[in-house]
């Protein structure tokens, strides 16, 4: 066990990691595709939407590390303590969406891998290769490898994205968009706004992933961080992910806005168009800047998602099996890692032209589940199991009330829009 009487700075390094992995999970399609498209179509008009979405979800994701540090157990264990209804609600939503989500982020990563390497393979073969790489990393290196690789990727991603934005600002070929942009208050505009804010910066159920990563980090280092240290880690990751979302919006605004192109296309098509227009606007020398930024954004998401779902499902299975005398062997993390990834590849292979519909369905389920998980996390934190010094401050409680009202209204608006204009 690491000693806890060391200086705050020396012990903080042991707490850092889970929040960065959460950020890596967040910085994927929502950033590379949705944020960049927001800038491409509306200039800087939708910065407020990113900030508002991030603010409204903040309390419910912050409750993840707060609960885990205060109790020493994951929020999934907390859901079970609230009642089996909470745990099985989470499990049901996860099972309905996990393979489609993993398949969606993997195929976008696959298209970028083809551009990065110049090796022309089918999207399915590249997707298989990407997932095999992720599985190998996680099976051999486990959480320790995930922690180290994500920290490296986050550095590369942050540097490459910052350079890409600075180059776009400084280029004579990239003009700052005029203040007047197309109205967002149209059928198509509101539909896009819902998609942008719904995934920004990450879904609330990711608080369960974060909780499990904290427990793994404690096992890895032998150090149990103080609440303040764990919240610093969370804030670095969460706020950093929100800042990078604005950076990708700036890329779209500076490079793609006013190009006259149609950006209402799939994620793989959008990333190809982004790279093409970025290069044609700034010059061929800028190709590697945008490709590296895009690939690291998507690979980090694919790697973290490939870890998150098996870790979550295996934990839930073993949590329930703890009631029996002999937990089954197939409930192990490695088994789930292979099974879930294989099923995601099956989804990719069989879906074909129906894949976009499946992604849309998963998106709908995720949006409608957001207020449910916000309520569960709120109830978990204010259930009376907390000691006074771990209870959230009043401002966070008030923010959670606002967030719950906003997220619920947002889900109702999303459902209304789907039923009225689909």
Question: Where are the regions that the model predicts?
Answer:
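Extracellular/periplasmic helix-exit of transmembrane alpha-helices
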Residues: 58-68, 214-215, 221, 239-272
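Loop-to-transmembrane helix boundary motifs in multi-pass membrane proteins
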Residues: 123-130, 236, 240, 317-350
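Hydrophobic alpha-helical segments and their helix-loop junctions in multi-pass secondary transporters
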Residues: 155-183, 193-212, 374-386, 410-422
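Juxtamembrane transmembrane-helix boundary signature
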Residues: 22, 49-80, 89-101
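Hydrophobic transmembrane alpha-helices that form the core helical bundles
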Residues: 87-118, 127, 298-317, 354-355, ...
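Flexible loop linkers connecting adjacent transmembrane helices
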Residues: 2, 35-39, 61-85, 113, ...
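Membrane-water interface regions at transmembrane-helix termini and the short interhelical loops
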Residues: 108-116, 131-153, 347-357
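Membrane-interface loop-to-helix entry segments
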Residues: 138-169, 184-187, 360-370, 396, ...
């Amino acid at each position: 066990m690491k000693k806890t009487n060391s200086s705050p700075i020396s012990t903080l390094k042991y707490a850092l990691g889970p929040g960065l992995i959460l950020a890596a999970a967040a910085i994927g399609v929502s950033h590379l595709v949705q944020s960049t498209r927001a800038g491409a179509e509306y200039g800087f008009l939708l910065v407020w939407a990113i900030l508002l979405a991030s603010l409204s979800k903040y309390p419910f994701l912050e409750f993840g590390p707060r609960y885990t540090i205060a109790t020493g157990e994951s929020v999934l264990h907390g859901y079970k303590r609230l009642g089996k209804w909470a745990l099985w609600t989470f499990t049901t939503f996860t099972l309905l969406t996990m393979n489609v989500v993993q398949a969606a982020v993997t195929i976008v990563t696959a298209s970028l891998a083809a551009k990065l390497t110049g090796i022309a393979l089918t999207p399915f073969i590249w997707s298989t290769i990407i997932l095999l790489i992720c599985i190998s990393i996680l099976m051999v290196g486990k959480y320790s490898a995930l922690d180290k690789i994500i920290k490296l990727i986050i550095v590369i991603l942050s540097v490459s994205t910052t350079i890409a934005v600075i180059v776009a600002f400084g280029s004579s070929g990239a003009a700052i968009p005029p203040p007047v942009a197309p109205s967002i208050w149209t059928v198509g505009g509101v539909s896009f706004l819902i998609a942008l804010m719904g995934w920004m910066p990450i879904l609330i159920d990711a608080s369960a992933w974060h909780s499990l990563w904290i427990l793994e980090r404690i096992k890895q280092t032998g150090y149990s961080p103080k609440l303040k240290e764990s919240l610093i880690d969370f804030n670095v990751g969460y706020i950093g992910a929100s800042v990078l979302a604005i950076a990708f919006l700036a890329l779209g605004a500076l490079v793609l806005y006013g190009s006259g192109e149609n950006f209402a296309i799939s994620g793989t098509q959008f990333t190809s168009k982004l790279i093409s227009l970025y290069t044609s606007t700034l010059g061929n020398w800028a190709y590697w800047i945008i490709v590296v930024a895009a690939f690291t954004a998507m690979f980090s998401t694919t790697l973290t998602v490939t870890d998150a779902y098996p870790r979550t499902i295996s934990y839930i299975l073993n949590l329930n099996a703890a009631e029996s005398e002999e937990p089954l062997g197939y409930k192990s993390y490695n088994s789930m890692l292979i099974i879930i990834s294989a099923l995601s590849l099956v989804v990719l292979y069989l879906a074909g032209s129906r894949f976009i519909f499946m992604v849309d369905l998963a998106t709908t389920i995720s949006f409608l589940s957001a207020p449910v998980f916000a309520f569960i996390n709120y109830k978990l934190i204010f259930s009376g199991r907390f000691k006074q010094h771990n209870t959230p401050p009043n401002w966070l409680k008030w923010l959670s009330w606002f967030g719950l009202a906003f997220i619920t209204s947002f889900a109702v608006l999303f459902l209304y829009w789907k039923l009225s204009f689909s």
